[in-house]
Amino acid sequence: MGPLQFRDVAIEFSLEEWHCLDTAQRNLYRNVMLENYSNLVFLGITVSKPDLITCLEQGRKPLTMKRNEMIAKPSVMCSHFAQDLWPEQSMKDSFQKVVLRRYEKCEHDNLQLKKGCISVDECKVHKEGYNELNQCLTTTPRKICQCDKYVKVLHQFPNSNGQKRGHTGKKPFKYIECGKAFKQFSTLTTHKKIHTGGKPYKCEECGKAFNHSCSLTRHKKIHTGEKPYKCEECGKAFKHSSTLTTHKRNHTGEKPYKCDKCGKAFMSSSTLSKHEIIHTEKKPYKCEECGKAFNRSSTLTTHKIIHTGEKPYKCEECDKAFKYSYTLTTHKRIHTEDKPYKCEECGKAFKYSSTLTTHKRIHTGEKPYKCEECGKAFKRSSDLTTHKIIHTGEKPYKCEECGKAFKYSSNLTTHKKIHTGERPYKCEECGKAFNQSSILTTHRRIHTGEKFYKCEECGKAFKCSSNLTTHKKIHTGERPYKCEECGKAFNQSSILTTHERIILERNSTNVKNVAKPSSGPHTLLHIR
């Protein structure tokens, strides 16, 4: 067995594995590597300090070093077993190592690097060994130096320019299927798994499989519930350091990622990437079940759950299950009173930043989402999506209990509670329960007397936005709800419903009167 060397106790990561490590794990790696090196020195084992150790001591990130800096001090071997030296690139685009295998016939031990060798001609001993080594490595570009009894070899791999591409911005590796380009071939290989469906990393807890090992690592925290990253501003904790970094921008308002196409700015690079697809018409991700196509693989994954009906995300508080993790996260806030997002205009606080953004439009009057069919504008994109169904008349959501169909899944969910009698939303003030959170929100205003929906025309204020919308029709004279029986029009659907009921009852009474037999002679005759 040969002398112990630093590489025997070193821990190595691939580029993909390194990116999966969070800050705490990278710090642990740094401490372990430095400790291992210190132990070798303490034991009196002669080793030259690797550049990796110098890098870690200076607090630099290993992956920011140039490739040639990452190679440990060139390994040295006796020429007797130099012919059995082969390169192996096990750490793609980050580290490279040379596997040195001891030749059985070699008698040299404790090899030391003798500096000062400039060329092969200076080496007087073991010329034969050098020639053998040179012959063995004809296929690999190399620089070979021989000094006395020892040979120094530095391998230069063909893809050593990978680091340079990071600075030039070039993306030479393109995937034909979707047209996406990458700087590194290894990243392209990883990306291909999205299209092929290859998911080699499986969770032992729930059986879910992933394309990348780092995705599996992140997923496991769902089962453990571990949240080591805490926000100093609001105390909220997160599973991943990157999520905490993005979250902090909610407090600062920072949006560093800007779209070159439309100028819109975002808090995270992932949100920008998702947004940029809006500007393209490409939809390379297709559902095999129904043929629907999507511009993001994540959207396809989310869509597939519609067909399976799977609800893997369960609330520990009330046992309610959800299809998506983000829906569970949103739901959990029902059980807490946490409202970290506050409106500077009126002081109202919200559980979600998106709700605050939408709320602000009440003050600004902004309605950025416009219907191409009728020109009507909305504050929320979801309201526009909901509105569009009015034009199509489609009702794809059907109740299995009574067969009633609905335009929106949310309406079906609300309707189902009629059959179950479920009323999960309870008023803390009076104890009254409701089957919809929105009704509870509206109900609470009875206790607070709050009326922040104000008519710009006459100044009248309302507790609900729907009441304000109805009221505005008085000023416009709009009467969109028309009775098919008599042609009379109304400004509220509820008034039309009441009107139709009156006509129905009147018609029923007339039918009864016509069908009723006349009294008189027949009755008298019967009496006689």
From Swiss-Prot:
One of its GO terms (biological process) is regulation of DNA-templated transcription. GO terms for molecular function: DNA-binding transcription factor activity, RNA polymerase II-specific; RNA polymerase II cis-regulatory region sequence-specific DNA binding; zinc ion binding. Disulfide bonds: none annotated. It is found in: Nucleus. Pfam families: KRAB, zf-C2H2. Keywords: DNA-binding, Metal-binding, Nucleus, Repeat, Transcription, Transcription regulation, Zinc, Zinc-finger. Residues 4-75 form the KRAB domain. A zinc finger (C2H2-type) spans 173-195, 201-223, 229-251, 257-279, 285-307, 313-335, 341-363, 369-391, 397-419, 425-447, 453-475, 481-503. GO terms for cellular component: nucleus. Its main location: nucleus. May be involved in transcriptional regulation. Belongs to the krueppel C2H2-type zinc-finger protein family. This is Zinc finger protein 626. It comes from Homo sapiens.
